[in-house]
Amino acid sequence: MKNRDSSFLGNKKVAVLMGGWSAEREISLRSGNAVLKSLKEMQINAKAIDLVSPEGSKLQLEDFDIAFIALHGRGGEDGFIQELLTDKEILFTGSKTEACKLAMNKVETKKVWREFSLPTPDFVEITKAGKSDMKITPFLSGSD
């Protein structure tokens, strides 16, 4: 691993947010632990925070200057944690709240792509459950 200068962080406390309550919890824990290991190797003051519920998230974020978001899926990529961190004035990695909310909404994201003439496959928005020969992907989650 190449040495990186982390002196700009000074004595800042970094929370590595991992786990979460989505179906992607296990991969998030692996990602978070890999990030934590790297930060510690760089002698950065980092601590793992395993978030298990939306309610608990609000309590566990005190006393940190920066959050490294290693959460996946709902709660981590949908704007929830970003909004919470923004409200608490904690700096964080990744996109801002509104970008996350938009990106997790597949239909709205495709509409934006089309607005900017970006190539994207045709799609149909289904608002009621019914039978279809199309593959249905979750609205606010991964693409199992």
Regions found by a protein language model. Give the residues of each.
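Glycine- and acidic-residue-enriched helix-capping/strand-helix junction motifs
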Residues: 21-33, 38
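Short beta-strand elements in bilobed, periplasmic/extracellular small-molecule ligand-binding domains
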Residues: 43-49, 120
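Hydrophobic alpha-helical packing residues
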Residues: 39-40, 85, 113
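Hydrophobic residues within alpha-helices
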Residues: 31-35, 81, 109
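A short, GP-enriched loop/loop-strand-helix hinge that lies immediately N-terminal to
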Residues: 17-21, 63-104, 119-127
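A short, N-terminal amphipathic alpha-helix
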Residues: 34-45, 61
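Eukaryote-biased intrinsically disordered, low-complexity acidic regions enriched in Ser/Thr/Pro
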Residues: 47-61
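Active-site nucleotide/adenylate-binding loops and adjacent lid/helix of ATP-dependent enzymes
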Residues: 2-18, 102-144
